[in-house]
Curated annotation (Swiss-Prot):
PANTHER family named in the record: FLUORIDE EXPORT PROTEIN 1-RELATED
Subcellular location: Cell inner membrane
MF terms in GO: fluoride channel activity; metal ion binding
Organism: Coxiella burnetii (strain Dugway 5J108-111)
Origin: domain of life: Bacteria
Regulation: Na(+) is not transported, but it plays an essential structural role and its presence is essential for fluoride channel function.
Keyword Ion transport: yes
Primary location: membrane
One Gene Ontology CC term in the entry: plasma membrane
Transmembrane segments: 3-23, 34-54, 68-88, 100-120
Swiss-Prot/TrEMBL GO biological process terms: cellular detoxification of fluoride
Protein name: Fluoride-specific ion channel FluC
InterPro entries xref list: FluC
Length: 124
């Protein structure tokens, strides 16, 4: 059952990532990997909220919710591999400031998003 839930969650998360990324690129252009950055920040925020909510607020078989939402949906939604290749492409194109900014913003804002998510999750 867990494998099926992870499969379904990953599919939904991947579709959500595709939609959010494309919307951000449509609105803001592709000069900077803003789509991946927004996806990873919102994914980190949701991870914090759902982690606390599932562990502290739900009763019953929390492993099913963890499989569907944390491992599945958020695993399919967020992407370290896209962050990595987009940063590499910035470096290869000589956009060193953009590459450094992408690394700094991704790390700092994703950690901040997870922290904020935990705080929000504890208030639910």
């Amino acid at each position: 059952m867990n494998v099926l839930l992870i499969f379904l969650g990953c599919g939904a998360g991947g579709v959500a990532r595709y939609g959010v990324s494309n919307l951000m690129y449509l609105l803001m252009g592709k000069q900077f990997p803003i789509g991946t950055l927004i996806v990873n920040i919102t994914g980190s925020l949701l991870m914090g909220i759902l982690f606390i909510f599932i562990l502290e607020r739900l009763s019953g078989n929390i492993q099913l919710w963890r499989s569907l939402l944390l491992i599945g949906f958020l695993g399919g939604y967020t992407t370290f591999s896209s962050f990595s290749i987009e940063t590499f492409n910035l470096i290869e194109a000589g956009h060193y400031f953009g590459a450094a900014l992408n690394v700094l913003l991704s790390v700092a804002l994703c950690i901040a998003g997870a922290w904020l998510g935990v705080l929000i999750g504890r208030q639910l």
